[in-house]
A protein has these predicted regions:
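Mixed-charge, low-complexity intrinsically disordered regions
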Residues: 2-163
Length: 163
């Protein structure tokens, strides 16, 4: 009886390990569905850069709710746009703590990183009244969802928080 149970546990463990390995080998789906030369997103990124002084002021008041979007190249060479919590903001750099890791990344990933301010693609700060400032690329996404008639539910609630 014991040998049967032990055999089932061993076979189950081997099967789970094999399934996990197979899943890790599957190529991830498209991680950047927005083209690099998308004019609306380029304008949003430009606006974010032009308004960094506003972000500095907001960060001073709301450091716990300040985020930035940055381009990160994964170990596979894929460019992914990632959101990070701002840990430190100076006149020349931003230090961020990423909440996750790039989808296409393999191996260790340093979640605390420093970037030049010019690398910031977007910024966002939640104010004390629950409204968001910045978030220019997200606004483009919400506008597109609204135009397509797909801005509903939680996404619509989130979109309503932008000043």
């Amino acid at each position: 009886m014991f040998e049967t149970i032990a055999g089932i546990v061993v076979v189950g463990g081997v099967l789970l390990s094999f399934m996990a390995y197979q899943r890790s080998q599957i190529a991830p789906g498209e991680v950047n569905p927005i083209a690099a030369d998308d004019p609306d997103m380029a304008k949003a990124r430009s606006t974010a850069q032009e308004t960094l002084s506003e972000f500095r002021d907001l960060f001073a008041s709301y450091p716990q709710t300040s985020l930035v979007k940055l381009p990160v190249t994964s170990s596979t060479g894929t460019l992914e746009w990632m959101i990070g919590d701002v840990v430190e903001l100076t006149d020349t750099y931003v230090k961020v703590q990423f909440r996750g890791r790039p989808v296409t990344h393999r191996g260790a990933f340093q979640s605390l990183q420093t970037f030049a301010l010019r690398d910031i693609a977007d910024w966002q700060a939640a104010t004390s009244n629950g409204k968001y400032r910045g978030g220019y690329t997200q606004r483009v996404t919400f506008a597109r969802m609204r135009a397509a008639g797909t801005l509903v539910g939680a996404a619509a609630d989130e979109a309503s928080k932008y000043d």
